[in-house]
Amino acid sequence: MQMSYAIRCAFYQLLLAALMLVAMLQLLYLSLLSGLHGQEEQDQYFEFFPPSPRSVDQVKAQLRTALASGGVLDASGDYRVYRGLLKTTMDPNDVILATHASVDNLLHLSGLLERWEGPLSVSVFAATKEEAQLATVLTYALSSHCPDMRARVAMHLVCPSRYEAAVPDPREPGEFALLRSCQEVFDKLARVAQPGVNYALGTNVSYPNNLLRNLAREGANYALVIDVDMVPSEGLWRSLREMLDQSKQWAGTALVVPAFEIRRARRMPMNKNELLQLYQVGEVRPFYYGLCTPCQAPTNYSRWVNLPEETLLRPAYVVPWQDPWEPFYVAGGKVPTFDERFRQYGFNRISQACELHVAGFDFEVLNEGFLVHKGFKEVLKFHPQKEAENQHNKILYRQFKQELKAKYPDSPRHC
């Protein structure tokens, strides 16, 4: 009897030990899972553990919350702004890629998600009521099927003030109702999109580029503001994070990322070596080379391409700002906003660069990172009203520069 009792005790002790071992293995598994790094590991995780229906419900709830208020009007009263159709948690010290797009150009998000590993903020402009509805459907579809969209992207919507966007009903049949993967959504978007020439909306509504830029970079400490059809070099986000984390002395400095454009048939270069090979044979050239060479010339491309190869990202040289330079840059601190009076084509970015200069910012060109625009910018690819818009904004820019003198009366700098 005593032997039987001892055997039972030993059995229960063994069972308890086995259960504890299983629990420890589960905790170890969860710990390893939470420590996954890199896109490949994340893709494997979502392949075997697809998002639960609850996460999709949360997306719908966020959309409903953002749209239910009816949005807010911008300062001009011409546009209705819906903040946070998608929201994401962002480290306040992170570098956010801020961009803007018409609905038809959202297809470029796919390339940005691949190249930029950090958080993105996207402002979408819908020129018509139908486009506003399509934008909400696209937001729902992309966030439902693309884990990266849910994890890393904040999305906002702007439309003419006379329109209101509505919550999409995923049960209704439509172009995106039966899609089941992220790639299917982008493939479908590429087929139904009708991208036209630059800024040609086909309506009497102006594209509010500076309103969209401000909305996308809102709340960011460090932001790289680019056009949606540009692609950053591979690893740029990680290199920027490492550089900025090593030093806190970047307030008042605009870290310039050199911008290029590539012949449309070419594959996007991933690193500086690939870029230089294409640059040497004329397949890559400075951004805006065929439209406004002085707009990017101060970057000093000849100096940049001849810098010695380095592994760490750093500022390579200082460039005094001069009119009409409009660089793409990363800056922290109290960065002036883009003046939202500038719409459509002309002087919308240079006006902000001018104010940066007057406000006391210095411009330093980075040694390794870069941006590439998809396709050469050509005069014939712009809409017929381009020159008229440019002349209108040129007059506004002259007024803007006079206003800066009153805004910064003690600044020794001018544009």
Curated annotation (Swiss-Prot):
Recorded topology in the membrane: Single-pass type II membrane protein
Lumenal topological segments: 37-415
Pfam families, sorted: Glyco_transf_49
UniProt subcellular location: Golgi apparatus membrane
Cytoplasmic topology ranges: 1-8
Enzyme Commission number(s) of this protein: 2.4.1.-
UniProt main location, coarse: Golgi
GO molecular function: glucuronosyltransferase activity; metal ion binding
Pathway assigned in UniProt: Protein modification; protein glycosylation
Statement: the UniProt record of this protein carries the keyword Glycoprotein: yes
GO biological process: axon guidance; protein O-linked mannosylation
UniProt protein name: Beta-1,4-glucuronyltransferase 1
Species for this entry: Bos taurus (Bovine)
Gene behind the chain: B4GAT1
